[in-house]
């Protein structure tokens, strides 16, 4: 019965042994939340899983570079290796061109080229020949001192770091194209997201947001994703007397400050947004500066250099496009905008607004996905 082998992402592999072990432990724990693992072992940079579950789910587990189905065997001579591979793969290469690649660790009376050559000679009569550049079948061997693994097909993982390995962030999550993609990108870096949504579109918006979160949950290694819903209409009602051209920036500052308070409460050490430089008037460089002024947490904007088409393409890859494309834009507070705001004027208007952020969070509805 085959086993499943996987290689952690290259960024994990190059870390110190102590850090690497920590990331590997979290990765293995996350894998166990996605598929049933009967047992596992760490083998010189490779994780070997014994599972009878659908291992294709590993394609959405961050921290994995490659995963593949392997056959394990023991040997005491080069002929033992050749016999095992010949018996296992003689029908696989039938009518096809093949190549053999060998990686070897240990002290042996033979080298990797010897093994590849002998296996090639043994399989040649069953095949259409050897093609080292573009084979139909590539037979890969990983050899240790007296045992090894053999496999033919590698599958790509999403790489990155395991979700939950690098901290938490509060995401300003509107549910449009941008914020789900930004969330996914932080998850790829090992971050566990806490989503903060200001409801401006009622049940339609909420239902679509929750469907997007269901998609993101597939990438979270089944770690819970918490969504805090805040009544956005209660917030916008406080802006009716504010300068119309500054209302959008004032609303964004309220969102940032709410995220800051929530982050401090939940021991998250950053805020994440889906903002892209100059995509809209509120996202010019000066307006981003004004928006995050005096926010004492790092603000991550993973999409800052992406254009809208690139973001939409990523949403298709992730799986959130279907729901993001149905979400209307809610512009309920002002038809005016300003591309170059003045900090002192924004702060002057802000001082006129009375908001108790602790109370705002206390009234928020928490949905755990």
From Swiss-Prot:
It catalyses: [ThiI sulfur-carrier protein]-S-sulfanyl-L-cysteine + a uridine in tRNA + 2 reduced [2Fe-2S]-[ferredoxin] + ATP + H(+) = [ThiI sulfur-carrier protein]-L-cysteine + a 4-thiouridine in tRNA + 2 oxidized [2Fe-2S]-[ferredoxin] + AMP + diphosphate; [ThiS sulfur-carrier protein]-C-terminal Gly-Gly-AMP + S-sulfanyl-L-cysteinyl-[cysteine desulfurase] + AH2 = [ThiS sulfur-carrier protein]-C-terminal-Gly-aminoethanethioate + L-cysteinyl-[cysteine desulfurase] + A + AMP + 2 H(+). Pathway: Cofactor biosynthesis; thiamine diphosphate biosynthesis. Keywords: ATP-binding, Cytoplasm, Nucleotide-binding, RNA-binding, Thiamine biosynthesis, Transferase, tRNA-binding. One of its GO terms (molecular function) is tRNA-uracil-4 sulfurtransferase activity. Its main location: cytoplasm. GO terms for biological process: thiamine biosynthetic process; thiamine diphosphate biosynthetic process; thiazole biosynthetic process; tRNA 4-thiouridine biosynthesis. InterPro entries: Rossmann-like_a/b/a_fold, ThiI_AANH, ThiI_fer, THUMP_dom, THUMP_ThiI, tRNA_STrfase, tRNA_sulfurtransferase_ThiI. Its EC number is 2.8.1.4. GO terms for cellular component: cytosol. Coiled coil: none annotated. Pfam families: ThiI, ThiI_fer, THUMP. Residues 52-154 form the THUMP domain. ATP binds at residues 172-173, 197-198, 252, 274, 283. Disulfide bonds: none annotated. It is found in: Cytoplasm. Catalyzes the ATP-dependent transfer of a sulfur to tRNA to produce 4-thiouridine in position 8 of tRNAs, which functions as a near-UV photosensor. Also catalyzes the transfer of sulfur to the sulfur carrier protein ThiS, forming ThiS-thiocarboxylate. This is a step in the synthesis of thiazole, in the thiamine biosynthesis pathway. The sulfur is donated as persulfide by IscS. Belongs to the ThiI family. This is Probable tRNA sulfurtransferase. The lineage of its organism: Archaea, Thermoproteota, Thermoprotei, Sulfolobales, Sulfolobaceae. The gene is thiI.
